[in-house]
């Protein structure tokens, strides 16, 4: 029991799963539902952690804990940057694929990686 390593779900100790990426529907973890890199030091049901690495023990993970506001802001900014980076990559790939298909439609002899 504990965290499910999928990016969008958290598994609570009782086996119940819930979303973990939406800010409005954030899952509040009970005190026993934390792993070594996901701490709730004051047992408030809040995730006050920056996910920067894997820790081997509770004591190693404590070094990752920041004050709630800083951790929340840092986590949100990092998540925002990652999402925007992936959105840009996907947008460029789709734009290139559409352009290549349009060019291939105009010239039947043209072969691209998108039309193979």
From Swiss-Prot:
InterPro entries: OMP/PagP_b-brl, PsbO. GO terms for biological process: photosystem II assembly; photosystem II stabilization. One of its GO terms (cellular component) is photosystem II oxygen evolving complex. Its main location: plastid. Keywords: Chloroplast, Manganese, Membrane, Photosynthesis, Photosystem II, Plastid, Thylakoid. It is found in: Plastid, Chloroplast thylakoid membrane. Signal peptide: none annotated. Stabilizes the manganese cluster which is the primary site of water splitting. This is Putative oxygen-evolving enhancer protein 1. It comes from Pinus strobus (Eastern white pine). The lineage of its organism: Eukaryota, Viridiplantae, Streptophyta, Embryophyta, Tracheophyta.
């Amino acid at each position: 029991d504990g965290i499910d390593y999928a990016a969008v779900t958290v598994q609570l100790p009782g086996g119940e799963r819930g979303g973990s990426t939406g800010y409005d529907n954030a899952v509040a973890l009970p005190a026993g539902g934390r792993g070594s890199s996901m701490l709730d030091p004051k047992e408030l049901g809040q995730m006050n952690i920056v996910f920067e690495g894997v820790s081997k023990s509770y004591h190693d993970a404590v070094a990752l804990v920041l004050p709630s506001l800083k951790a929340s802001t840092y986590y949100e900014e990092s998540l925002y940057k990652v999402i925007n980076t992936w959105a840009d990559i996907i947008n460029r790939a789709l734009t290139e694929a559409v352009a290549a298909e349009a060019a291939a439609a105009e010239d039947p002899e043209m072969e691209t990686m998108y039309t193979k």
